[in-house]
Amino acid sequence: MKIVVTGATGLLGKALVEQLTINGDSITVLTRNALKAKQVLPSNIDVFQWDPLSGPPPQESLEGSDAVVHLIGEPIQGRWTKRKKERIFRSRVTSTRNLVAAIKAMDAPPFKIVSASAVGYYGDRGD
């Protein structure tokens, strides 16, 4: 399968890319930092630079894909100030909207989309 992964340089993303590579899947990564991705991920993957808050990803990064796994998100550690909460929310919601906009514009979109985020999961931390 050809699988597009966002958030591939994070904890879950790196483990997922490693396993998918072992399985023989073709991997394309959408990342904010292509240089970092090329340094920490296997060399046999395609890497596309994408700012998930500024608009849809490059259309060519999604072409021919069978599935998309969307893992992008602002790290949650640290004090949850109003500004931090906004960054967490935007990193998950805006990035998903931008990704979906690109997928909706495709003639042959991927048949599977998995998005793993939790904007409301953590609850009141007393901050």
Tell where the protein language model's regions lie, with residue ranges:
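Conserved glycine-rich Rossmann-like NAD(P)H-binding loop of the short-chain dehydrogenase/reductase
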Residues: 25-32
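Alpha-helical structural signal in soluble globular domains
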Residues: 15, 19, 40, 98, ...
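SDR active-site strand-loop-helix element
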Residues: 6, 30, 68-72, 113-119
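Short glycine-/acidic-enriched loop or helix-start segments at secondary-structure transitions
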Residues: 14-16, 39, 79-80, 123-126
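N-terminal Rossmann NAD(P)H-binding glycine-rich loop of SDR-like oxidoreductase domains
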Residues: 3-23
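NAD(P)H-binding glycine-rich loop region in Rossmannoid oxidoreductase-like domains
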Residues: 35, 39-95
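Conserved Rossmann-fold NAD(P)-dependent oxidoreductase catalytic core, especially the SDR/UDP-sugar
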Residues: 97-127
